[in-house]
C-alpha cells in the first residue's frame, strides 16, 4: 500500500481526477510528512501500550482501510492532501513496528539477518509488485492484468488490490499480536 500510494498518487490525481501536475506532485509531500509523524507516534504509542507493537499495527491497518476508502473517493485538492497525510501517518507506523517486533522473536545473534529478511521480502514483493503491476493495471492505455481469471484494469482495480493487501496484512499480524501478548503476559508474571 505504501509504494502504491508513494509511487502512484500523483499519477492517479492527474489521470483520474484531472489535477494539475503541481497539485498532484504535492500529494507526496503530505504523505511523507504524515509518515514522519506517524512513525514517531506509533512507536511512542506502542511503548505506552507496553510493547504491544502488533496490536498498534493492527489498529493502524484497520483505520488505514477506511482512509483508503476516502482516498478512492475524494476529489478536492485539500481533502486529498488531508487524506494522504493521514494515510502516511497510518502506513509508516506498522512498517516501523514490524521491524521492531522482529527483535522480540529471534535470538540476539540473528537480529540483523532477520531484520534484513523482513526488509528484503517487503521490497521484493511489496515494492516490486506496486511499482510494476499496479502501474500496469492502472494504465488506461494497457489491457490490464489477468489474475485468477479476473481482468484487473483501471484505478478501481488498483484500489481493490490495495484493500486486499491491507486485509492480508491485518490477518497476518493477528498471530504475531497474540504471540506478542503471550510474551508480555509471561514477562509480567515473572516480574510479580
Kindly label every feature range from the protein language model.
Residues 52-101:
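C-terminal transmembrane helical hairpin of 12-TM major facilitator-type secondary transporters
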Residues 71-72, 155, 159-192:
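Multi-pass alpha-helical transporter architecture, strongest
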Residues 108-142:
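A late C-terminal transmembrane helix in Major Facilitator Superfamily
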Residues 50, 102-112:
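Paired intracellular helix-loop junctions of major facilitator superfamily
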Residues 53, 136-166:
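A membrane-interface helix-boundary motif in multi-pass transporters
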Residues 1-42, 95, 99, 126-134:
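Extracytoplasmic gate region of multi-pass secondary transporters
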Residues 27-31, 114-118, 158-161:
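Hydrophobic positions within alpha-helical transmembrane segments
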Residues 39-51, 138-139:
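Helix-to-loop junctions at the C-terminal end of transmembrane segments
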Amino acid at each position: 500500500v505504501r509504494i502504491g500510494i508513494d509511487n502512484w498518487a500523483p499519477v492517479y490525481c492527474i489521470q483520474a481526477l484531472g489535477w494539475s501536475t503541481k497539485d498532484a506532485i504535492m500529494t507526496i509531500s503530505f504523505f511523507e510528512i504524515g509518515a514522519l509523524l506517524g512513525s514517531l507516534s506509533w512507536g511512542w504509542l506502542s511503548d505506552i501500550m507496553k510493547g504491544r507493537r502488533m496490536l498498534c499495527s493492527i489498529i493502524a491497518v484497520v483505520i488505514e482501510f477506511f482512509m483508503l476508502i476516502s482516498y478512492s473517493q475524494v476529489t478536492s485538492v485539500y481533502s486529498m492532501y488531508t487524506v494522504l497525510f493521514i494515510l502516511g501517518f497510518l502506513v509508516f507506523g506498522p512498517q516501523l513496528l514490524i521491524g521492531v517486533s522482529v527483535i522480540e522473536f529471534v535470538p540476539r545473534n540473528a537480529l540483523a539477518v532477520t531484520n534484513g529478511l523482513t526488509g528484503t521480502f517487503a521490497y521484493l514483493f511489496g515494492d516490486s509488485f506496486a511499482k510494476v503491476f499496479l502501474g500496469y493495471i492502472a494504465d488506461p492505455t494497457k489491457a490490464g492484468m489477468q489474475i485468477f481469471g479476473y481482468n484487473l484494469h483501471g484505478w478501481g482495480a488498483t484500489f481493490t488490490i490495495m484493500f486486499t493487501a491491507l486485509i492480508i496484512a491485518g490477518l497476518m499480524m493477528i498471530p504475531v499480536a497474540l504471540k506478542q501478548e503471550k510474551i508480555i503476559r509471561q514477562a509480567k508474571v515473572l516480574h510479580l
